């Protein structure tokens, strides 16, 4: 699970930040600040450019599956192949993030999933077009337009109500899944078909999806 969502940060590596500046990243920054506000933008800046105690990028690159591995996963047939529903409450989502989130499902190496999006932005025509586009192209992408924003809790409940799967996962509207995320979940379920809940590690990724940072590696449950 990968998130672009901000959290509190420490000192900023200014040299690293200035090296990343370009007309493209500056425009991205202004769009982010306009959508989320200056406070969240500042938190995001700290989060993105604070120094890491242990460099995560090299570790991540060493463990991500190769294209050959992903292709092998796509061909694998499991004895137990449950439908997995991913519920997403969406409100005024930047369409770039919306596309990235949907496409992270479409490229999953495990194919028995459905994406249940509740759109609480009835006046956002860009979101409407993107949702209609993906839904028309892939029947696993489903969405429901609300007449008004009911708040994050009720929007989420409406997304859960759409779900038909044996297992239901929740994503924020600007989250992503690694391409092998659902495969790894279903692989574990082969040995634990009676499991009631599963959880995964997560990290954060740049808007361009080219650099991962701030991992949250969770311990075994006890």
Language-model features, listed with the residues they occupy:
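N-proximal low-complexity "stem/linker" segments adjacent to membrane-targeting elements
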Residues: 31-106
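Short alpha-helix within the catalytic core of nucleotide-sugar-dependent glycosyltransferases
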Residues: 99-103, 128, 157, 165, ...
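Acidic donor-binding segment of Leloir-type glycosyltransferases
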Residues: 106-148
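Glycine-rich, basic loop-to-helix element that forms the pyrophosphate-binding segment
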Residues: 146-163
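A recurrent flexible, glycine/aromatic-enriched loop bordering the glycosyltransferase active site
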Residues: 153, 161, 211-222
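Short aromatic/hydrophobic "clamp" motif used to bind/position activated sugar donors
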Residues: 168
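The conserved acidic donor/metal-binding loop of glycosyltransferases
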Residues: 172-176, 201
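Conserved donor NDP-sugar-binding/catalytic core segment of glycosyltransferases
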Residues: 180-214
């Amino acid at each position: 699970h990968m998130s672009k969502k901000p959290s509190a940060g420490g000192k900023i590596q200014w040299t690293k930040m200035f090296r990343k500046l370009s007309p493209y990243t500056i425009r991205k920054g202004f769009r982010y600040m306009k959508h989320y506000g200056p406070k969240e933008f500042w938190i995001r800046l700290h989060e993105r450019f604070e120094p890491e105690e242990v460099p995560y990028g090299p570790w991540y690159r060493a463990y991500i599956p190769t294209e050959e591995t992903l292709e092998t996963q796509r061909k694998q047939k499991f004895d137990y192949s449950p439908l997995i529903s991913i519920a997403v409450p969406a409100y005024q989502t930047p369409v770039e993030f919306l596309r990235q989130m949907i496409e992270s499902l479409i490229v999953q190496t495990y194919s028995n999933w459905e994406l249940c999006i509740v759109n609480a932005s009835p006046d956002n025509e860009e979101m409407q077009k993107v949702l209609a586009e993906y839904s028309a192209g892939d029947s696993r992408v489903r969405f429901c337009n609300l007449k008004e924003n009911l708040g994050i809790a009720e929007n989420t409940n409406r997304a859960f109500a759409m779900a038909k799967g044996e297992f239901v996962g929740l994503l924020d509207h600007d989250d992503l899944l690694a391409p092998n995320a659902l495969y790894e979940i279903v692989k574990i379920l082969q040995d634990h078909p009676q499991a009631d809940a599963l959880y995964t590690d997560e990290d954060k990724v740049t808007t361009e999806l080219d650099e991962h940072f701030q991992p949250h590696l969770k311990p075994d449950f006890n």
